[in-house]
Design a protein with these regions (language model features):
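Short aromatic-rich membrane-water interface segments that cap or initiate transmembrane helices
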Residues: 62-74, 136-157, 244-256, 322-336, ...
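Membrane-targeting alpha-helical segments
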Residues: 486-568
């Protein structure tokens, strides 16, 4: 898919660097002020919670999970689209992702940060957070309960956050190098030198990076599915009416993709206008994102119908009452808001004209974000506020502290995104250059030094390499601004062994996960939980699978990235080795051994 038709490589660099190198606009400062005020309100609400305790919130004897867990699940869902765009679409070679993946990855990281705030505060004593980690403590052999879905959450979300972070960071190395070589101020140059890890764009480094990104995509794909699946287990493994259902895992995953793409679409529509990136995030990209939202929304609609049909055919009066209460009870307004926002409005995306309408896309994206929040609210609150004893029935109403924390996370999320837009490239310039059409970029005359050949296109580069090899010249190194397909073969580079190493790293995670769960739950401190004694490892293995699975992915991803850095000799403050700065922008350099 052609991203551009009339942009040179240098123009792409100029366009993407402009929001970072230019002065912040008045609109940016206004948005910064608003988001900062919202963040400060959230900080005040958190301080009140820590000072007065959970009683400052709207929780009561029935609805112990309400605002916090609703917001937690919603933010985790928002964070799903970034890794999905980066990983799944990369594996399927969908080139349209390159204009949106970098901002989507940043959105994932910022959203997961917001999500982590709510369960930490919900602990009641957040200063004892470290008790959720399997580390020795002053109580002797008191370990975490690996049979608990709440602990599965800790491992799943921590793994998801860290893998998404390294995935994002590795992809940013060429972008940081481009900004480093363009920087005029010494402080900026030092910062981007630190962030780029001395990236020089050598051919072998590009080969390793391409394989590393593919392997990370392969690791992140099951991780994306596992995270919201495990989040759904918080509800599905309970015996609460309205929660105890097997449809929750796929239902939650589809809903996460739905809300995540809605937030990505909303952010990118705003950014393309404010930062003048219409040539990169085109109407075609918006149409494709709306298509994904249409598919995900249709799956969510089917899940709603399936969930309702299952409850009605269950012959359980308690299950039937929960769904009847949702549609006609005290929170019916929330239920029907969910239906309109998540089912009715997105189905209008069947019309191509509406899929390509900026105004309608913004409206649908906002509606889906609102609707998916109400979905989580309906699932949690309406299943709890009417229990088995009518005498204990109650209503939940959020306090200003509840509202303040949620508004604070919204403000902090957009505040981070504003700072990101002023400091980091919002578009993966190296990937955009690699998939652009045949542009009319400015050609510079080929310059020959004693050992350098400077070229202006990948086609010229490959032709020159063939010519030099036919002349018997020794090519010492090649530097390119982006990954050039066919370059490794032209230079005769051997395939890396990162794939085999990643498999071994996954085995290390498997053995560590098995040992950890066996030692803590079976050998050192066996516990009888709910009448289920931890007698043998194999009897309890199904409950240990989520933690073991996450540790396999954690070890495989992080040790892979460490191996990539070591093999490519990349580290903070390393001095870049590219002989000319333009090799990170729009020039292709061949370093040839002088015959002298």
């Amino acid at each position: 898919m052609q991203i551009l038709n009339d942009k040179s490589y240098h123009t792409i660099s100029e366009d993407i660097a402009r929001p970072i190198e230019g002065r912040a606009s008045r609109a940016w400062w206004i948005a910064f002020g608003i988001t900062l005020l919202a963040t400060l309100w959230g900080i005040w609400a958190i301080w009140v919670t820590l000072r007065d305790g959970i009683g400052a919130r709207g929780l009561n004897k029935n609805v112990g999970w309400a605002w916090d867990i609703t917001n937690f699940v919603w933010w985790i869902g928002i964070g799903h689209a970034g890794t999905l765009i980066s990983a799944v679409l990369l594996l399927f070679r969908q080139q349209w992702r390159v204009a949106i993946n970098r901002s989507a990855e940043a959105m994932t990281i910022f959203a997961v940060l917001q999500a982590s705030i709510f369960p930490i505060l919900h602990l009641g004593r957040p200063w004892l957070l470290h008790f959720n980690l399997p580390i020795p403590n002053q109580y002797g052999s008191l370990w975490d309960n690996f049979n608990s879905p709440l602990l599965w959450d800790v491992f799943a979300i921590a793994t998801y956050f860290s893998v998404s972070l390294v995935f994002w960071w590795v992809g940013l190395l060429p972008d940081f190098a481009m900004l480093r070589d363009r920087a005029l101020k010494p402080f900026q140059k030092k910062i981007y030198s630190l962030l780029s890890f001395g990236w020089s764009g050598r051919a072998k480094d590009w080969q390793r990076m391409e394989e590393t990104m593919l392997l990370l995509a392969g690791i992140a794909t099951p991780l994306v599915i596992s995270v919201h699946t495990i989040v759904s287990f918080d509800f599905a493994t309970s015996v609460v009416s309205g929660w105890h259902t097997t449809i929750f895992p796929p239902y939650f995953v589809a809903g996460a993709i739905f809300s995540g793409f809605a937030m990505v679409s909303l952010l990118l529509i705003i950014l393309r206008k404010v930062c003048k990136l219409e040539a990169y995030t085109t109407l075609k990209h918006i149409e494709l994102m709306n298509t994904v939202m249409l598919v995900a929304g249709s799956i969510v609609a089917v899940a709603y119908l399936t969930e309702f049909f299952t409850a009605m055919r269950s012959h359980s009066e308690f299950e039937q009452y929960v769904f009847h209460n949702r549609a006609t009870g005290a929170y019916a307004w929330a239920f029907w808001t969910m239906i309109i926002c998540n089912i009715v409005l997105p189905q209008l995306l069947w019309f191509k004209k509406l899929r390509r309408s900026i105004t309608f896309s913004v409206c649908v994206a906002l509606a889906v974000c609102v609707g998916m929040w109400f979905e989580r609210f309906v699932i949690i609150v309406t299943s709890l506020h009417r229990g088995y004893l009518p005498s204990s029935w109650t209503m939940f109403s959020p306090t200003w502290v509840d509202i303040g924390i949620f508004v604070g996370t919204l403000g902090f999320f957009f505040l981070l995104f504003l700072l990101y837009a002023r400091s980091f490239p919002m578009i993966a310039q190296a990937e955009v250059k690699g998939v652009r059409g045949q542009g009319t970029g400015v050609r510079e005359q080929e310059s020959l030094n004693s050992y350098l050949l400077t070229l202006t296109s990948p086609e010229e580069l490959l032709d020159k390499i063939k010519e030099l090899k036919s002349e018997g010249r020794e090519i010492q190194e090649v530097y390119t601004p982006f990954y050039v397909h066919g370059l490794a073969e032209a230079l005769g580079l051997k395939r890396t062994r990162l794939g085999k190493a990643t498999f071994l790293y996954g085995l290390i995670g498997l053995f560590f996960g098995c040992w950890l769960t066996y030692f803590t739950m079976i050998k050192d401190w066996p516990m009888d939980i709910g009448g289920k004694p931890n007698a043998t490892f194999w009897q309890n293995l199904p409950a240990f699978v989520p933690v073991i699975f996450e540790l396999v992915l954690y070890f495989a991803a992080h040790l892979l990235v460490i191996s990539f850095f070591i093999r490519s000799r990349l580290y903070p403050f390393k001095k870049a080795e590219n002989p000319i700065k333009k090799s990170s922008d729009d020039k292709f350099v061949i370093q040839v051994r002088d015959k002298k």
